[in-house]
Amino acid sequence: MAAPAASPVDTPDTKVANLTIGKALNEALRASMEADPKVIVMGEDVGKLGGVFRVTDGLQKDFGEHRVLDTPLAESGIVGTAVGLAVRGFRPVCEIQFEGFIFPAFDQISSQLAKLRYRSQGRLKRPW
């Protein structure tokens, strides 16, 4: 015989936020951007529109166009630009609107980012 375990929500000192996934992502991006000026958000319609699912709503207004960048409709270009920014010390966050569009962009990670150190004879380091 066992008593049911107490849920973490049942403890008096625990605060649980009731957020949508989009709102939670927005708050996490905002906190990251406040903590680190090298965090940049980029993607299609992430600026004034706030992203297709409004995940980036208000970020461009608060952090400026130089940190929340609207990009052309070119997922491979978005990720390739992010790779270059990361190598230079920035912390880019890419929004790819739909998972079906990530496959062409994955080449930037597997064929470019993964080989930068060797192609540059060690001058460029991967950002991790």
Predicted regions and their residues:
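Thiamine diphosphate
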Residues: M1-W128
